[in-house]
Amino acid sequence: MEHEFWLQSWHEGRTGFHQLRVQPLLQKYWPTLDLPTGSKIFVPLTGKSLDMAWLAAQGYRVLGVELSLLAVQQFFAEHGLKPAVRESHYGTHYTARNIEVICGDTFALDAALLSDCSGIYDRAALIALPPELRVPYINELMTCLPAGCSGLLITLEYQQQEMVGPPFSVEEAEVLKCYSPRWCVKLLERNDILPQEPGFAARGLTKLATAVYQLQRLAV
């Protein structure tokens, strides 16, 4: 995903990727991770996702990162929150209650920031990246998370030649290859969702599935 494409999408209101409800797969599978209340959860490329508010409502501390200032501002405004704002070398931090969102580049984060995260929730980051950026994302960013960190990864699967991403198709074989050997990856569920996504059908897709994986960071 090019920075300019993402920023322009928010500026022009082309945010059809934003879900107007909490992701059902998050609600279904997050409790199975059995993470203690108060754990810090890392959410990359947040947009203004309602999933952050849901995680916070479960008692978790949310640490998100988002490139678009508009997305960050809209998230807090739409939840009636007035965040405290501070600057760091990571970007601009917006914090209200138990939610902190850094407006900055996801690839600028490091282990010093992420070493106390017990969980990871990726619904939008991996599928937003073209193939050439997925391995750096996993090798350079995901390895900053500590051993024992667990979470969920949600992907889309379709015939890539039928549509220009983002979002991109990321098949199970690629997930397993990219996350190995530093992560234990388990497929939890895969569903055909094209009937519920007419917008993707209109873009030419003949098949569309979503898959959810459980991730566990290994001491490697």
Curated annotation (Swiss-Prot):
S-adenosyl-L-methionine listed as a keyword: yes
Gene Ontology terms for molecular function: thiopurine S-methyltransferase activity
UniProt-listed Pfam families: TPMT (PF05724)
Protein name, as recorded: Thiopurine S-methyltransferase
GO BP terms: methylation; response to metal ion
Top-level taxon of the source organism: Bacteria
Residues reported to bind S-adenosyl-L-methionine: 10, 45, 66, 123
EC number: 2.1.1.67
Organism: Nitrosomonas eutropha (strain DSM 101675 / C91 / Nm57)
Catalytic reaction annotation: S-adenosyl-L-methionine + a thiopurine = S-adenosyl-L-homocysteine + a thiopurine S-methylether
Location (main, coarse): cytoplasm
PANTHER family: THIOPURINE S-METHYLTRANSFERASE
CC terms in the record's Gene Ontology section: cytoplasm
Keywords: Cytoplasm, Methyltransferase, S-adenosyl-L-methionine, Transferase
Subcellular location: Cytoplasm
EC class of the enzyme, as a word: transferase
Family per similarity comment: Belongs to the class I-like SAM-binding methyltransferase superfamily. TPMT family.
